[in-house]
């Protein structure tokens, strides 16, 4: 697992979590949704005009697809497929969320080009109610900003779940803790996240995701949204069932930084380089994130969090 990081103990901790899962039957992963959004905004003189515009544009998805497919405008992406749109009227402004699939690329440049072309060549030309202003991104698209909307519903990136059932033996021997201690920490951590208004319900998802992103040429500006996470852990017969849900994982196996020699080499090592491999890579990222969650939580769950303290004291270095 390629990890680019400067945190002492991160790699060995992640691998410890992976070892515990492997000895318990391994991870299971699922890709639930795949969308990337660009949220344009159209400003009117009145709320009534914004509502009328909303009612006109909502049924236009199929005509928009046909227009994009047949439009000879240079620079349009044929890989960005418009799947749906959604409107939100706020006063005299109508926000229009274009939702695309973008194949094996993250696709923000693709959907920027296509959304701009739609706004200029289709919407402004055909809308029965003309807006005063059109803005390509009205800040509802979720790009590089964690938000409650995309944490709850997904829809900006891939929604991926990883799960495993840890055996009592693996928890005791590999993780050096107990099922009861892990379950108790999960309870405490969930309530702590809620009480603090945290965007995620998890322990340390950004750590694994950032390390993987840097190693494999992903856009590190998307670590924040990609590491929104909802973890669960509960006791089952003879073990502990653990999951992590990443509702906005933005990853690619083609384009951008993935073409750099070192990044491409690491993606190739994971059998994730090139077209047709992005879902595999997304599932590996989710599994790696869960592996670190398991190990770090195990260290924190010991009496007085002694193992967590020792790991950071011994591997973090003295200052």
Describe each PLM feature range.
Residues 210-213, 267, 286, 298:
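Generic hydrophobic alpha-helical scaffold/packing signal
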Residues 274-319:
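Extended hydrophobic packing segments that form well-structured cores
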Residues 101-259:
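Glycine-rich anion/phosphate-binding loop at the beta-strand->alpha-helix junction
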Residues 39-41, 93-95, 132-135, 221, ...:
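Structural motif
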């Amino acid at each position: 697992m390629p990890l680019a990081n400067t945190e002492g103990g991160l790699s060995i901790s992640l691998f410890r979590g992976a070892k515990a899962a492997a000895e318990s039957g391994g991870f299971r992963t699922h890709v639930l949704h795949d969308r990337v959004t660009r949220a344009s905004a159209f400003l009117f003189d009145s709320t009534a005009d914004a509502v009328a515009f909303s009612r006109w544009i909502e049924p236009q998805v199929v005509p928009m697809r046909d227009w994009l497919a047949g439009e000879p405008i240079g620079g349009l992406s044929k890989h960005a497929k418009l799947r749906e749109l959604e409107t939100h009227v706020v006063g005299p402004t109508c926000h229009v969320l274009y939702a695309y699939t973008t194949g094996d690329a993250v696709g923000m440049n693709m959907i920027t080009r296509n959304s701009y072309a739609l706004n200029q060549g289709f919407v402004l030309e055909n809308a029965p109610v003309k807006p005063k202003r059109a803005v390509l991104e009205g800040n509802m698209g979720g790009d590089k900003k964690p938000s409650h909307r995309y944490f709850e519903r997904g829809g900006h990136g891939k929604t991926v779940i990883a799960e495993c059932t840890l055996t009592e033996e693996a928890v005791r021997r590999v993780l050096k803790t107990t099922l009861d201690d892990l379950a108790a920490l999960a309870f405490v951590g969930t309530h702590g996240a809620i009480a603090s208004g945290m965007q995620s319900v998890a322990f340390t998802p950004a750590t694994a995701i950032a390390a993987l992103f840097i190693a494999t040429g992903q856009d590190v500006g998307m670590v924040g949204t990609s590491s929104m996470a909802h973890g669960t852990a509960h006791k089952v017969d003879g073990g502990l069932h653990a999951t992590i849900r990443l509702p906005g994982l933005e990853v690619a196996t083609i384009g951008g930084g993935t073409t750099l020699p070192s990044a491409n080499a690491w993606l190739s090592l994971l059998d994730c380089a090139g077209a047709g491999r992005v879902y595999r890579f997304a599932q590996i990222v989710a599994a790696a994130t869960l592996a670190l969650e398991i190990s770090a939580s195990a260290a924190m769950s010991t009496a007085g969090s002694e193992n967590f303290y020792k790991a950071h004291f011994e591997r973090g270095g003295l200052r």
